[in-house]
Design a protein with these regions (language model features):
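Alpha-helical secondary-structure segments
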Residues: 56, 132-139, 166-172, 207-208, ...
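N-terminal secretory signal peptides
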Residues: 1-21
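Detector for C-terminal structural segments
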Residues: 25-41, 75, 215, 219, ...
């Protein structure tokens, strides 16, 4: 039986999907009605969400500088906390399709320059106010205004205006965009009362949990919201408590002792050890996530493409993947797209070539030591990765100084601030969203300072191209530009590796992001 049918049967059992749609999809896959109904019955027996208890989660990624303003969410902690209290108009399913959330349906104009979203009625904010299309308009305007500071600013720059039309909201775009609804899955775009303009850090949203305690860098607690609009499908625990456990050993110990029920970012080197703990299950999924070494392409010495090329050629990707990921990932190729994305085209793999790296480095004229900043919060094994890289660079005559930065404050003081550092990306729903978020001029999260007017024009052209073959070619050309000229080194695409204790129910493997694509806080429950 396909993974898709397993997933869809659980969705029906949990009240999040339609039995009719499931049977239709099963028939399309050649599954008999008898077999399909048996699968549904099995899922219904196993599903049965239980209400109550406190679901405890230990996460790497939190810091004292974390904000509850969704516009500023920049790490795993703020992503998962946002999923507790807030919701977007649409979200991704396990199979990469769009699922209605605060919007019930959508349609586009024939030229794909205007998109109309019908807003769900009867949804209440945590402050008792009913959500209206005006709140949606204000939210989108806050993330796209001239003074906006938002991780979604790159994708929102394509929006010319957002207006209300009765029960709907109309997005008028500057250029055609065939994938525009997918962009609205961005986790920064949580709908807030009056768009969050009154108090963006109040964490007042429409999600299943209302924030009752928030100690940045320590813990966040959400209590089940009594008037949540979809309580059958989500919000099963009475409370969800997220504790920041940035140290990998401490996080693992907390799960093994039962102090927490779920942890993220399991280091591949301890997977076999964790599996031996009674009742503990390791959950891994391959997807779009990738680990990166970011160079500011507008800052010396990285503003010289020979330096950038030398540093790319000095990366032994296979060795790094073998030693760090241990089978939980694949080799990267210096652009952020892999086969998980539609319209992907592979490029010839860049080899580890210290001689060629030395050639480009000598050609650049640079001879000084290059400072690389890293931290274990950048990604599991980031410090080890930096040291491996230091050694392979040395073989090309490139001197790298590795500076290990504190985890607390890394995302506010180092990432997107310092010219050479390690980081990670969880990937995005579609190629346009990934490119627009981090690679176009003007994007707040352009963490390689890659500014290329020709590339920017290609992003716009691909966005509006309805001929899939032509669009695929544009994406290939874009990938080649970043591969050869960009400031990003992508050594690997990582699997997400989480671990859950014996009391956790409702877990469904999801490739979109760690912890069930960010849905574990809302959709998991505690078994008796």
């Amino acid at each position: 039986m396909s993974q898709e049918l397993d997933y869809l049967s659980q969705e029906v059992a949990l009240g999040r999907g339609s039995r009719r749609d499931f049977l239709g999809r099963a028939a399309a896959l050649g599954i008999s009605a008898t077999a399909a109904n048996a699968l549904l019955a099995s899922a219904a027996h196993a599903a049965g969400p239980r209400k109550g208890g406190t679901l405890k989660i230990g996460l790497q990624g939190g810091a004292a500088t974390d904000s509850l303003d969704p516009a500023l969410a920049a790490n795993q902690l703020t992503f998962h906390v946002g999923r507790m209290w807030g919701e977007e108009l649409v979200r991704l399913t396990l199979t990469g399709q769009l699922r209605p959330y605060l919007a019930t349906e959508w349609r586009s104009s024939p030229d794909a320059k205007a998109w109309v979203f019908k807003i769900r009625k009867g949804v209440q904010f945590h402050n008792g106010k009913e959500m209206t299309p005006d709140d949606v308009v204000a939210t989108m305007q806050r993330h796209s205004g001239p003074n906006a500071k938002s991780g979604a600013l790159g994708i929102m720059r394509s929006v010319d205006s957002v207006t209300r039309d009765g029960d709907s909201v109309i997005f008028t775009l500057k250029d055609a965009s065939a994938d525009f609804p997918f962009l609205l899955t961005d986790y920064h775009l949580l709908i807030q009362p009056n768009g969050g303009n009154d108090d963006p850090k109040a964490a007042i949203g429409t999600g299943p949990y209302k924030i009752v305690t928030n100690e940045p860098g320590v813990r966040t607690i959400g209590a089940r919201f009594a008037n949540y609009w979809d309580s059958k499908a989500r919000g099963h625990a009475e409370q969800v408590e997220i504790t920041v456990l940035n140290d990998s050993t401490a996080r693992t110990a907390a799960l093994q002792s039962g102090r927490v029920h779920i942890i993220n970012r399991v280091d591949p080197k301890v997977v076999e050890l964790i599996k031996k703990a009674p009742g503990v299950t390791v959950q891994s999924a391959s997807g779009r996530g990738h680990y990166v070494f970011n160079m500011f392409a507008n800052t010396a010495p990285f503003n010289n493409n020979d330096v950038r090329m030398a540093l790319k050629l000095a990366m032994d990707r296979k060795d790094m993947v073998d030693k760090l990921l241990r089978g939980f990932g694949t080799i990267g190729n210096d652009f952020p797209i892999n086969a998980s994305y539609p319209l992907f085209t592979a490029l010839p793999q860049r080899p580890y070539d210290p001689d060629k790296a030395a050639f480009h480095y000598k050609k650049s004229g640079h001879t000084d030591t290059i400072l690389l900043r890293t931290s274990e919060v950048a990604f599991p094994g980031a410090v080890d990765a930096a040291q491996l890289y230091q050694a392979t660079c040395a073989k090309a005559g490139i001197k790298i100084e590795v500076k290990r930065e504190p985890g607390d404050g890394y995302w506010s003081n180092v990432w997107n601030k310092q010219p050479f550092s390690t980081s990670f990306w969880g990937g995005r729903a579609v190629q346009d969203q990934m490119w627009a978020t981090a690679y176009i001029t003007g994007a707040d999260w352009n963490d390689t300072r890659f500014f290329n007017p020709a590339f920017d024009k290609m992003v716009v052209a691909a966005r509006g191209e309805l001929n899939q073959a032509k669009r695929k070619q544009i994406y290939q050309d874009m990938a080649l530009i970043v591969h050869n000229e960009g400031g990003v080194i992508v050594p690997m695409f990582n699997d997400t590796i989480d671990a859950i204790g014996p009391k956790v129910g409702g877990w469904i493997k999801n490739p979109n992001a760690e912890l069930m694509g960010g849905m574990a806080t809302a959709e998991c429950w505690l078994e008796a």
